[in-house]
Design a protein with these regions (language model features):
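C-terminal alpha-helix plus adjacent terminal tail
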Residues: 1-121
């Protein structure tokens, strides 16, 4: 819906924003959008706990049946800083291929509440 709204605009800002979004990981765009939606109703402390879990999942994607080197984060770093080809191979490659089932596990805390690193906020 965000992409469709931007595409319907004729303002240069909308066009440049679409160009930037087209270069980003479709999966992580969905995760970021879901994060914003969820954070609206959270306390700052709970939002920071959610954020910490997201960071963990970005580097340790066991919930996606991937190894640490197979993350969108690692792929973005590879394309930008290691190989410098600026051609990330996102998985999935299209926004329309991302499912709710791919996004939801990012929001399951890797820790029980009593063991969360930010439990005392």
């Amino acid at each position: 819906e965000v992409v469709a709204a931007l595409a319907s605009e004729h303002h240069p800002w909308a066009k440049s924003t679409l160009e930037v979004l087209a270069k980003r990981s479709p999966l992580m765009l969905h995760v970021a959008f879901e994060q914003i939606r969820r954070a609206r109703g959270m306390t700052l402390e709970d939002e920071l706990r959610m954020e910490r879990g997201l960071v963990r999942h970005c580097f340790h994607p066991h919930h996606l049946n991937r190894r640490a080197g197979q993350t969108e984060t690692a792929e973005g770093i590879r394309a930008l800083a290691v190989d410098k080809d600026h051609l990330p191979r996102w998985e999935p490659a299209a926004l329309t291929a991302v499912t709710a089932e791919m996004v939801a596990p990012f929001f399951v805390s890797p820790w029980p509440s009593w063991a969360h690193p930010l439990r005392e906020l």
